[in-house]
Amino acid sequence: MAVKHPAFRKKFPLLVTGSLLALQPAFSLQSFAAEQYDCQASPTGGWACAPKTATSALPPRPQHSRSAVSTTSGSATATATKQEPAPVLVTESKGRALASRSPDYSHLDWVPRDKLTAAQLAEAGPYCAGAYIEPLRPGMDDTTPLDESPMYVSAKASRYEQEKQIATLAGDVVLRQSGMQVEADEASLHQAENRGELVGNVRLRDKGTLVVGDRAELQLDNGEARIDNAEYVMHQAHVRGSALYAKREETAIIRLKDGTYTRCEPGDNAWHLKGNNVTLNPATGFGTATNVTLRVKDIPVFYTPYIYFPIDDRRQSGFLPPSLGTSSSNGFSLQTPYYFNLAPNYDATLYPTYMAKRGLLMEGEFRYLTESSEGQVGGAWLNDQEDERKLQSEYEDQRWMYSWQHKQGLNSRLLAEVDYTDISDPYYFQDLDTDLGIETQSYVNQRGTLTYRGDSYTARLNVHAYELANITDITPYDRLPQITLDGKLPFNPGGLDFTYGTEYVRFDRNLRSGFFVDKDGVTGRPQDLWYDARLTGLNRADGERLHLEPGVSLPLNWSWGFVKPQVKYLHTQYQVNLDGQGKADLATNDPENQWFGVDYKGSPNRGVGLFSLDSGLYFDRNTQLFGRETRQTLEPRAFYLYVPEEDQTDIPIFDTGEPTFSYASLWRENRFSGKDRIGDENKLSLGVTSRWIEPNGFERQRFSVGQAFYFEDRKVQLAGIDYRGRQDATSDVSPYALEYLYRFNRDWRFSSTFNWDPDQHATRSGSAMFHYQPEDNPNKIVNLGYRYRNDIVRYDRDSGTWTTNPDYGNPTLADGSPNPNYIKNYYKIDQHDFSVIWPLAPQWSLISRWQYDYGRNRTLEAFGGFEYDSCCWKLRLINRYWIDYDEVSLDPSRNDEPDRGIFLQIVLKGLGGVVGNKVETFLDQGIQGYREREDQAF
């Protein structure tokens, strides 16, 4: 039982517990008590002790010199003592823990893996032989400041010298104050100096940190301590180390002299940091060290005069792990990122990257978060010394990029968004990588949006421009501006829903003209003409579009099914501007020209009605699937759609395309995306879906199949396509559309789509994907997929027409000779993709991917290698082959170049990656489930 000391604490913060031996001042200082006392401070400042029941004989007062490390007390009749061997110094351990203190390293709270609980195993690393588990103790969660907290003391024996004001304790000595606890074999507490000396098996515990040593000095009023021959453990961070001595400051900061730091297990020193002065700050979660060597198996491999490293997952300013690499275009590269932890709600990162062939790329980003907004601002600049592209069109040697992504809620209904990126030249992302998270597609967005959400409507103002990030695409239309208002009336007379959709948008763009200059300075040839300059007729138009779409429907829903009849009217008004070349193309008298018979109208319009009837039923029954109890559903659906034909050949195509056919196409009101074409339809779509659902809600299997029956040809097509030349536009039926999903369990999944053309007796498109990744062992990943698609409707940049032809160019030139630039099946998709990460042995895993294009008989990407993973470090070595897209010509056949590389990644857990961080990029992009694997890994 602890006795709490009141006002006396300020002078000498000592509280004496049961089993503590104390001597009254009246006794001789050389006598020994044969009974125990409960003591507390008297009103005069002395001790007031009451005797307890007699117990067994206590050992005599320990006799030791001030410099002694530890002395073993014998019985009262002992006449001689045996000299103990000198302790092993931590400097002799070479990064390992001292087995001399405990062969099983239990002195560091190390618990073997087979003795961990299920919860502790979940927190431990997958390849760790155990974990540091802090034992429960009184007051471990106490956050009271030391100067406001009493001290509790317990020991098997004690002695107090009134004249010197020294209390001597022996046997399982424990001092506890607030959340800090110190243990030792022996202790001397000096009341006048408010300090203590502890000897033998010293343990200091505080805020998830344990420091073990042979001898310690403790300042009793503020918790400052020095522990000699020290080892330490930080339980949550799973790190340990040692030092000639360790100092604990009043602020709980730990300073180590000749200290080490590692995340490796106590008996392992695969790697560790060693520095003259090491500082660990649990309050900030970071440490620093000076004159540091990184040692692998005690061999120094790296030196730095200063290092700043994390000891937990909190953010803090400092250098992030560097990245080294080589490439044919950049040469040797070194990136040394620096992170600025400016405030809890905003930070910044600088990414200086030195490239031997190009120079120094300075890239950085600033991120922010407020109660109503979030976003990031980034930028980069490089004075490019690589002159390979200096003759190419639109190239700039002063390379730059800046971006701003922002979201802000102006109130509960109004949302503002910005996504703006600009680049110096269209080759920027082909030559340079970015760490700012910008999606490097064929263009970058320059968009600002205001969205207002009412109770029954949504209004949006959008300003959207594009900056091309390549030279082989046609300049897209900017929407400057786009205004939409969609919703329904707030009343429902007779159960009717009155809906409306409105849009106004202005389309504008600046077309390139003239000829492209390639990297050799060659230009002026027909194939060098910019694709923008090859546009003809209405494809060169810009203008404005106003679209109105009122509708009324009667949704009827029951537990067993639904019926929804709907009527709409779609009206679109245009204001079209066309340059002289476009008007001249429309005036052609050539019947073979796609613009023959098309008149230029400055204000074309279109109005067309739409009727649809959607209906479905729902049935279910209890059944079994492979011995499992399930509820099977049967959900037939019928959808009738009628849209009359309206001639739309005089309307330009601004933002419209034709999506590829799928099961979802059966239920669409318009087979085109965008509003420049409203497809004529007179069809009935029939489909059925069946699901197998287990009692816990797990969907084991799902199967859908459907087909559309056409009563009229689909005459409305994209510009340049004659419906009479498209078999699928004149067929009476659509392809059979199938979708299938089966989950073998929560880890195994198989999904497939399949579209079969009954007229051609051929597959239009299909896919099959197998994915395996166990929840309880995400280190295992298997992906096997196949995709086939031969029904893509695309705009052919070379000919300037819409087409379904999958080839690039024509097989022959105008003179009948073979076309050297012709590429068969260039746009056809016929690929398999296989990837795997699989453990071969404990700690060893195979990593591989193979993506192959059957249409062009070539490997798109292939890599293979291995991974070694231990408790404290990881290594990956991967050999990779891939197709690199680097635009040097308008001819796609010259822009695909194979490349190869061997990639090494080393990760020192607790420090981050040392080399090869870029390996993460292609593993994340190439292997489904890789990110989940890394996120769930310890």
UniProtKB/Swiss-Prot annotation:
What is the official name of this protein in its record?
A: LPS-assembly protein LptD
Q: Where in the cell is it found?
A: Cell outer membrane
Task: Output compositional bias ranges, type Low complexity.
Answer: 65-81
Family the entry assigns: Belongs to the LptD family.
Q: Where is this region: Disordered?
A: 52-96
The residue range of the signal peptide is 1-33
GO biological process terms on file? Gram-negative-bacterium-type cell outer membrane assembly; lipopolysaccharide transport
- Transmembrane helix among keywords: no
Q: Name one Pfam family in it.
A: LptD_N
| GO cellular component assignments | cell outer membrane; transporter complex
Does the keyword Membrane feature in the UniProt annotation?
A: yes
Q: Which Gene3D superfamilies match?
A: Lipopolysaccharide (LPS) transport protein A like domain
